[in-house]
């Protein structure tokens, strides 16, 4: 029979392997940090869109009246290999700081 240590070790290894994301699930947290560089922070901005009734074109609301929230540093440092979309279902941007207001000119979308 298998010893209890062997079973526990096998279960722990299986859980670890399952926790590592497969390639191709989206850009990782570290990739987003590299795009932002040291001077900007990785942020999650709302990506609701407003349709222009005359032209039918979609205009991102976050450019006009949205808000961007910094992704917490503990998520950025611990989860380097996890796809960034697991933490931000909206638009991932590089921002100079937390943006809430009429025009978020200090945020640049890097992933959507």
From Swiss-Prot:
UniProt induction comment: Highly expressed very early in plant infection concomitant with appressorium formation and also abundant at the time of symptom development. Also expressed during conidiation and in mycelial cultures starved for nitrogen or carbon. The MAP kinase-encoding gene PMK1 and the wide domain regulators of nitrogen source utilization, NPR1 and NUT1, are required for full expression of MPG1 in response to starvation stress. The CPKA gene, encoding the catalytic subunit of protein kinase A, is required for repression of MPG1 during growth in rich nutrient conditions.
GO MF terms held by the record: structural constituent of cell wall
InterPro entries hit by this protein: Hydrophobin (IPR001338), Hydrophobin_CS (IPR019778)
N-terminal signal peptide: 1-19
Subcellular location: Secreted; Secreted, Cell wall
Protein name (database record): Class I hydrophobin MPG1
Recorded domain comment: Disulfide bonds are not becessary for self-assembly, but are required for secretion to the cell surface.
S-S bonds: 36-94, 44-88, 45-68, 95-107
Lineage, top ranks: Eukaryota, Fungi, Dikarya, Ascomycota, Pezizomycotina
Keyword annotations: Cell wall, Conidiation, Disulfide bond, Secreted, Signal, Sporulation, Virulence
Quaternary structure, from the entry: Self-assembles to form functional amyloid fibrils called rodlets. Self-assembly into fibrillar rodlets occurs spontaneously at hydrophobic:hydrophilic interfaces and the rodlets further associate laterally to form amphipathic monolayers.
Phenotype reported upon loss of the gene: Affects cell durface hydrophobicity and results in an 'easily wettable' phenotype. Reduces the efficiency of appressorium formation.
Role description: Aerial growth, conidiation, and dispersal of filamentous fungi in the environment rely upon a capability of their secreting small amphipathic proteins called hydrophobins (HPBs) with low sequence identity. Class I can self-assemble into an outermost layer of rodlet bundles on aerial cell surfaces, conferring cellular hydrophobicity that supports fungal growth, development and dispersal; whereas Class II form highly ordered films at water-air interfaces through intermolecular interactions but contribute nothing to the rodlet structure.
An example Gene Ontology CC term for this record: fungal-type cell wall
SMART domains: HYDRO
Encoding gene, per UniProt annotation: MPG1
Similarity comment: Belongs to the fungal hydrophobin family.
